[in-house]
């Protein structure tokens, strides 16, 4: 029931007729499902409900009348999800509810307080505890631990939600008191930037003396151009290199003091200096370096520096893995301080919750192509994968952890998912990642988060409940919340008989009397002979005459659903307080009924069907005491299995179909680009150095296009960029079906548990098995297509045309030095280094076969990729050649007229002496 009018609707349902069976059904659902707290905050509505319940003749209504606080508040809940609950607002709502219940007078038909062995369920006691706890929550502030709910109110759903919400705030505020003790200026300002940006994002304290983001951004942008790869020198984008692009964008945003256009920003890179000086204990803030290495970008760093970086990273991750293993291995519970210490350790090296998600995305979108020749990269990435997976599930558990049943249920789901993701049946094994080097089971390592069940408190409440039906309802609630953490013998060693004994003045009934009475009972009867139903002979006789026959009809699936549920309810309710001999059988029957309702109402309760099998097994154990050869039919349980699993199968079939359709849709662009890249690698181009353009061979060859070299290079880069983006888009399509497949693995594991249940019911599994095969085939297809795309010519087209993207053989700087060469100061070293460059990278290996010209269709595609490609002469810049005369450019002469008083040259009056030369004289001169 949801909404603020839920209590009003329940009151109308109770007073609208339908008989005591219908009224008991409504009250049972009310006690199990609860009502929203806002629905209880109307004083008149609450009073009307209590007055209505006081007039009902059922046993459950008597309990609610006498123990109104426990009955109304125990299952009351806040509508908001746990992460959205404001503890202060919740405390105020709880305080108003306490005031309303305190103002309700005792009902006229009820005693002031029924006699009990203790005050566990006492209305006044519970109201005081609730009021006190509401005050404690209102005063709660981090970093203090949340106040512990006193007494039994810690079992109340709304109190659990408040306690849980406080713990979420407590864990979110748990940050290390000091991240970096002292500031040691690094060689490269990039490390300072990464530390400051990460610390500010995560709210970590930074050491004094470290520069601000503004200073560091200015230094990086203005003084370290080597750390940025401009768009003109890279085909990578925010799609193909999201982390590197985002890191550079953050720097430029701070530098520009505002928003900048993401497309215009470069990509953040690194040099040997960064690789050799970055500290490994901050490893995971270097996410852009790890992304680049995964995608074969080394930015001309030396092999030695790259391998040293990987080696130091592996050493650090080995130490971190050993610490985590030691801290969690074999630990059933950790203290809050120990849990915070693990969080601090992860945060200190850059493994925040958001960082774990970033790395998981990077790993999921790795290119399916050989990585650089780095010996340790596969091991390095295996450790990154394992530690980020651990961090991901650690933070998920931390965000859901509190000592409550609410947390227990959620944590079980998280750990089950972690176990499924880490299973060997998971097909995702990237070729660039080695087998997991840190061999521990994450679901076991994080099991310390699972809170222990408050067994003593649960047993105390169970013993204090005076109603057998309410005990059954409470046990159902406990089993639903705590599952296997609660022992099966919760009711043992407790007097399950009524609080008051029935005194009869007639002789005890005989077996024949009991059997005759049972034969006369009809489903739906509510009146009963108390002398008969209290007889020790009644349980066996009722089991033979009604319990087993009705169950057999239900389990053989011979009854219509509503009729079957009605008959089960009657078995649970008939003489519930008097027929004490039926209590052991009714307890599992009541749990079974509500598990069936969970399945039919699609509440998706965890393990509902498996728990139902447990209940049926326990029920037939009791039945066989009266009917030893009683067998459990399977048809109804199999139909429930199909009902529960069919929507899951259909939804996931639709998901994988959409994935395959999306994959099919994404293929044409990749194929088109791959074919075009392959064709370009087969062609022989002519280069005209005079006009700096490329002549492209086409069919027909009469007028081949002349493409300026700059436009040709731009087209090559665009093709490579488009191919990489299309490949990433193709792999990104699998993002939603990967978690879907994890859910499928969980269902398969659940099916395996069902098939190995002691009842040995053969549940149909063909649909799930076929669905798994479909997913595996889809993953295999994606892997092959992505690998093929990454190995096409177009994926690395700039590498094939690498000679066009080399630096100039004689750069402009060298030309300037040549023009201003000074023999007294300059050397020829720079010229020699420039001339030592190879003219070409090596012998080009063209693909064999294929056409030697571009078709018109391919030419149109090139023009679509870059409209300037075939714009012929219009795209060729005008020639810079000029017409020269036989005159020299004479620089302007600056004359100091104070020193030089004349404006004309006057030759000295010296006598010129000439020596006549003859041919004989010249010969004589050379001979000598």
Curated annotation (Swiss-Prot):
UniProt GO cellular component terms: host cell Golgi apparatus; host cell nucleus; viral tegument
Region (Interaction with large tegument protein): 482-928
Subcellular location: Virion tegument; Host cytoplasm; Host nucleus; Host Golgi apparatus, Host trans-Golgi network
Any single biological process term in GO: virion assembly
Key words, A-Z: Host cytoplasm, Host Golgi apparatus, Host nucleus, Virion, Virion tegument
Highest taxon above the source species: Viruses
Any Pfam family the entry gives: Herpes_U30
Keyword Phosphoprotein applies: no
Its biological purpose: Plays an essential role in cytoplasmic secondary envelopment during viral egress. Interacts with the capsid via the large tegument protein/LTP and participates in its transport to the host trans-Golgi network (TGN) where secondary envelopment occurs. Modulates tegumentation and capsid accumulation at the viral assembly complex.
Subunit composition and interactions: Interacts (via C-terminus) with the large tegument protein/LTP (via N-terminus).
Family: Belongs to the herpesviridae inner tegument protein family.
Listed name of the protein: Inner tegument protein
Source organism of this protein record: Human herpesvirus 8 type P (isolate GK18)
